[in-house]
């Protein structure tokens, strides 16, 4: 025993000595490669001192002898002063150990290398000459010496040098012949000196000196390649590298690329010998081989013997599968296990050694930490062996790996061990009994951070999502292993039956921790578990409500949004709305529902009759609204709550949509549902609780500082409503239980949604897209599908134009706001209190308000938004009431600019606030409460009391009633306005005469139009879909869809009709808005000018044009309804899309209604004038046929025929001027209506044949004189005509220069005698007068039709002569 111990000690000492020698060699070569001469000399000197004490280190001496030529020739020759400067080098140089070698080197160095180089040159020339003549080589230096080996052993240094050079020159010639294939590869060169090991000591000195002194005639690369053909190439290449560190890369490159010349095995031996120089060489060679993807066995051998980083190399192979596929394929070959098995044995030995050390040294924390990391890395490699390399682990490796699971120091790596259990093939068959495997899994549940991971894996097993298990293992290991399906199923069976049953999983998920500030950077498993359980409906199966957990996690989230949160909320909505599991006891379910329905019937029977009547009224509303196209504005009265009527088959139910009010029947149903939902014996399907409105609002208020929570809450609400709409749409005609419909399928009402900060959330996610990347697409879809009014393209374009406007950068910033604002605010900015006080003094201090508005306009939208409510409440009423004052009128433009900037950010709240202000303003006595306004009126109106008395005397009862009806003082809600957008037209009349304010009104109108349309569509989808599925029920659903479409069209057409009426607010005396305006603005009757009205017309026509483009069908509906003919010049001129009317004018001409035919002809005449194209000519010919048919047939009565002629004569003159080709046919039609048409035709032919045509001077003078006389009598009536509604096509220019010849032709026309009463007719036909003015100011039935026909023919002919 003592002897064996001594032997072990000796062996250990030898191993230590070998390791120290290797380390010393590494230090020397690394110092040479790095050029660190100080460290090199220091190390050699230390080694020299050690050698003096121990003379047995011959290996060290030999290794150092290799580097001596480099030190003496390569270093000292270049820097001779280094010997005197460096003490370490001086000691080394004068050391007795190296004195002989140094002396020999100096002798070789002292040779005359000029003669040596000439010798080389001569020998090369001789060999080339002999090779050329193919003679035996008898003239070389080596051939002429007898017994050359004796000469080498006993000769002087020059002879030895020449002999070695002769040997090298011959070797170079042999190498060239081998490369050129002039000799066989099997031919060997027998080098007498350089390939003889006994001469290596001398070669150690000669070879480096040849490389330093003789490279002029010997190529270094060729020399390196030729050495590889020798038997001791390993040693000579090593010698070259030791003395030529600068050529390291080139030498390695030559060796690796010479496989084809010298063979694979020889290259391996050379490279292994080079690896002995240092670890740097071995790492470099391995890197080169891996990059070239060659010699995989050598790569593994270098790793195990020299580099010794097996774990890192194999990890790289497993992780980078594509790049290291060649290595993977080599390892997977069963016949190549010899090299790889060494690495496996090394890994197994490492695990055994660590296991023993842990057992003996359990208290050494530093070693334990290192050991735990090594074990974790090896276990990860074992997962890769079985999963990627196809290597089945043996029982010893499995056992030693599992033995670390229960070690306390490995608790942080429990996930790696879990992956090992899942990946290891044949694990269940290897471990007996199975209870041990169950124990390992239970231990992983209790220790470490593997509990939630095991729960998630068990969920995947329960839901048969094996691919997700592989993905989970990939995320833990860093690579995707190929898991054996059979082995994985065996583990899954144990996990799901012994540890995590399905019911336990459902209950355990409720207890999962809620992560604070959950975002996408958290690798949280809880949300993944809940998501998969929701998607597979396991919670529903075991009646587990996880809604509270989801809502709590939602309120704890932050940015960037976790990628699973939107999907989690989607699944939660689906589980709340669409339960899929029903109990078999359907009879008990039916009885409970019948009981609930009976209890609720008592509270709803009384309202059913009223609801039925309301439904009938709603059905006929479209017809009533269609008939009312002009004149009045209809609306609804605002109320605190909105009543929603829904119809289910033949039954009708009424429910209050206010979130705080619930009917008695519904409360009974809710209590019944809550009392029976938890009982499995009740037979009711399980439902998760719907999140109430109060919880949602409280969460939003509590998360004012966390916008991500608000966005997620709004996303949930919108997703819930969207799911309800889709579910009810899919269930159309299918039976739905009444209890389900009244509890689960209750969408959040529109009034509640209007209070949510949806618009702000849109701005937030669009400005921070990276933080909300996973929620942006579904969130924008939900908003677009439910609130399309928030995506107004016009507002976006205006905002973009404003941002790109360079003039905005030069806005003057006054100092007023900072001086006055600083009095009330320490920060120097404006507060709402200061702004409110200043706005109250607007009439007395308009300049202050002007400066403040200019300052506010320089703020960003985010900074400007808090002042919006103050501006609207205090400034807008003053602007409306005192718009005629120049000081107030100047404030409109900056106010509107601010309004337009903040409106896209908060459309719903700003629109509602603005409309409530505009509809609640009362001009009578509201201004008396304002002290500043009262002072202003007293200073500027001395007779204010007298004016008020006169105004009161002029008011009558009818006007007071109209004021009460049209301007109610109320507070409209969002639901009120979207139910009837016409409420917007109840705004103060000042808005309709002020272009900036009217522009605001149009934006609000568009917002509520889109909202109303979407609300009607949603009501259609969310209306009760229960029923028996009969044909009559399907027909009823189709009828409801048609009714909603008709209602939307009718609503939009009514809005267009009212807007068109506004265009004539100063043109005609209507009973509509013009009358309202005049009644309400008696104080400021001339408060607007035609320029404002023209601008408003342009705004209206642009708005209508956009509606026509969005829905071309509406243009047909509006024109089939018809409007005043005075609007045609305005619509045709200012609405570019009016050309669409060409498509349906023929259909309009074919209508049986005479009014529609007249309107079609009038519309066609204006369109033809603007669009003189072939298509309009074709339609004009069709209208000509219709006119001829109406006038020449007996279809019309005499009165209708006269009415028809009076209406279309101006249009005929307009058409004939546009298309002269139709003039003759139209003149013929008109002449057919004259009693003396034959005589008229004869005179007309001679009249047309004349070259110049002028009217008779007598007739001209006569008519002009009468016109002047009548113009005085009818001054008021003629001046009221709007010049914008006239058309120059009808103007008659009577020339004063009359040709006598033409006068004779004109006198021959036999006109009917004109009475004095009818002479006024001719007075109207003069310059700048038209048929339209004649028609307006004269009763057409009092004018003989023959006179009008005569005049029309004159106009046609006049137009032809131009």
Curated annotation (Swiss-Prot):
One of its GO terms (biological process) is RNA polymerase II transcription initiation surveillance. Keywords: Cytoplasm, Nucleus. It is found in: Nucleus; Cytoplasm. Residues 945-955 have a biased composition (Basic and acidic residues). It holds the Pfam family INTS2. Coiled coil: none annotated. Residues 1-10 have a biased composition (Low complexity). Residues 1-20, 629-660, 928-963 are annotated as: Disordered. GO terms for cellular component: cytoplasm; INTAC complex; integrator complex. Component of the integrator complex, a multiprotein complex that terminates RNA polymerase II (Pol II) transcription in the promoter-proximal region of genes. Component of the Integrator complex. The core complex associates with protein phosphatase 2A subunits, to form the Integrator-PP2A (INTAC) complex. PANTHER family: INTEGRATOR COMPLEX SUBUNIT 2. Belongs to the Integrator subunit 2 family. This is Integrator complex subunit 2 homolog. It comes from Dictyostelium discoideum (Social amoeba). The lineage of its organism: Eukaryota, Amoebozoa, Evosea, Eumycetozoa, Dictyostelia.
